[in-house]
A protein has these predicted regions:
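Conserved core of the sugar-phosphate nucleotidyltransferase
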Residues: 1-48, 55
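Residues that scaffold the ATP/ADP-binding catalytic core of kinase and kinase-like folds
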Residues: 9, 39, 81, 90, ...
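Glycine/small-residue-rich pyrophosphate-binding loop that anchors the diphosphate of NDP-sugar donors
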Residues: 25-32, 119, 231, 249
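Catalytic cores of nucleotide-enabled group-transfer and carboxylate-activating enzymes in metabolic
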Residues: 27, 39-40, 58, 149, ...
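A short, conserved alpha-helix in the catalytic core of glycosyltransferases
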Residues: 50-65
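Extended, small-residue-rich solenoid/repeat segments and analogous flexible loops
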Residues: 62-166
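Glycine-rich hexapeptide-repeat left-handed beta-helix
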Residues: 163-304
Length: 304
C-alpha cells in the first residue's frame, strides 16, 4: 500500500509464490534486536526445502502485532555477491557509477575505465586524472590538481593545483599543500610537503616535514628507519637538496640551506648553511689513459 506495509516474504520455490508486484527480496533485513531475538525462535522449517527461512520473520512479526515496511531500490544497488565473479560485477557497477558522478561534478577523467576509486575518495572540481591511476581509501584531492598516469594514492590529502606523477606513490598520512609537486618514481609516506615544494624525480620521502618552496633533488633518500624505530626529519623553507643525497634521521635542516649533491647528512644543518659530506675529488692527470691502455692489452691477451 501507500505506506509500504510488508506482511510476508515468500520464497520463489514455495507454492504460494506469485510475483505480481514486480518486487523481490534483496536479502537485507533491519530489525530491533529484542524483537528479532524473540521472533527468530519461532521460525519453523515446514516448507518445500525443509529450511529455516529468516524471511519468515516478517510474517511472524505481523502475527504478533509488529509492523514491517520495505524500501525500494534499484536492482544493481543490492545485487547478491556469492562468488568472485559476482563480486567483480558489483565492483564494476560501483566504479562506473563513481566515475560518472565525478565527471558530472567537474572532474576530468581522460580514460575513465582505467581509473579506480575507493568508496570514500573525494576529488574536487577542475582536477584532471590521467589514465591508469588507482585511489586507495582515505584520499582527498582539492581543486585543479593533476594526477598523472600510473600513480597509486592512499590515505593522502592533496591541496589545490598540485601535480602528482607519473609513476608516483603517495602512502598514508601524506599531506601536500597547494602547488606541491611529486614527480615520477617518487614515494611519499607520513610526510608533509608545504606550498610549492617539489620532489620531481626518483626519491623516497618518509616521516618528514618539508617547508615551503623547498626542492628535493633526484635520487634523494630520507633514511628514516634504523632497523627498529622510525625517525623524523624536518626540512625548512627555501631549502635546496642536491641530487643523490641521503638525509639520515633524526635530522633538522634550517631555512635557506643547501645540501650538496651526493652528500650523506646525519647532523643538523643551521639555517642558510651549505652542508657537504662526501670524499674530496682527486684528478690524476694522465692516469686514465694509462689504465685504459693497460686494460686493452689485457683484453687482447685474453682473446689470443
Amino acid at each position: 500500500g501507500p505506506k509500504r506495509t510488508l506482511i510476508d516474504i515468500i520464497e520463489k520455490n514455495e507454492p504460494e509464490y506469485n510475483l505480481t508486484n514486480g518486487l523481490s527480496n534483496s536479502g537485507i533485513l533491519l530489525a530491533r534486536s529484542r524483537i528479532l531475538a524473540d521472533l527468530i525462535q519461532k521460525i519453523k522449517n515446514n516448507n518445500a526445502k525443509r529450511e529455516y527461512y529468516l524471511t519468515d520473520i516478517v510474517k511472524l512479526a505481523a502475527k504478533h502485532g509488529y509492523s514491517s515496511t520495505y524500501v525500494q531500490c534499484k536492482e544493481d544497488e543490492c545485487i547478491g555477491v556469492n562468488s568472485q565473479l559476482e563480486l567483480t560485477i558489483a565492483e564494476k557497477k560501483f566504479q562506473d557509477d563513481f566515475r560518472n558522478r565525478l565527471m558530472a561534478s567537474g572532474v576530468s577523467l581522460q580514460s575513465p575505465e582505467t581509473c579506480f576509486f575507493s568508496f570514500d575518495t573525494i576529488i574536487k572540481v577542475g582536477c584532471v586524472i590521467e589514465p591508469y591511476v588507482v585511489f586507495g581509501t582515505g584520499v582527498k584531492v582539492q581543486g585543479f590538481s593533476i594526477i598523472r598516469s600510473f600513480s597509486y594514492i592512499e590515505g593522502a590529502q592533496i591541496g589545490q593545483r598540485c601535480q602528482i606523477g607519473p609513476f608516483a606513490r603517495l602512502r598514508p598520512r601524506t599531506r601536500l599543500s597547494d602547488e606541491a609537486k611529486v614527480g615520477n618514481f617518487v614515494e611519499v609516506k607520513n610526510a608533509i610537503l608545504a606550498k610549492q615544494t617539489k620532489a620531481n624525480h626518483l626519491s623516497y620521502i618518509g616521516d618528514a616535514e618539508l617547508g615551503e618552496n623547498t626542492n628535493i633533488g633526484a635520487g634523494t633518500i630520507f633514511c628514516n628507519y634504523d632497523g627498529i624505530n622510525k625517525h623524523r626529519s624536518v626540512v625548512g623553507d627555501n631549502v635546496f637538496v642536491g641530487s643523490n643525497s641521503s638525509l639520515i634521521a633524526p635530522l633538522k635542516i634550517g631555512d635557506g640551506s643547501i645540501v650538496a649533491a651526493g652528500s650523506a647528512i646525519n647532523r643538523d644543518v643551521p639555517s642558510e648553511s651549505l652542508a657537504i659530506s662526501r670524499p674530496m675529488q682527486q684528478n690524476k692527470i694522465g692516469l686514465g689513459k694509462k689504465i685504459m691502455l693497460k686494460l686493452q692489452k689485457l683484453a687482447d691477451k685474453i682473446k689470443r
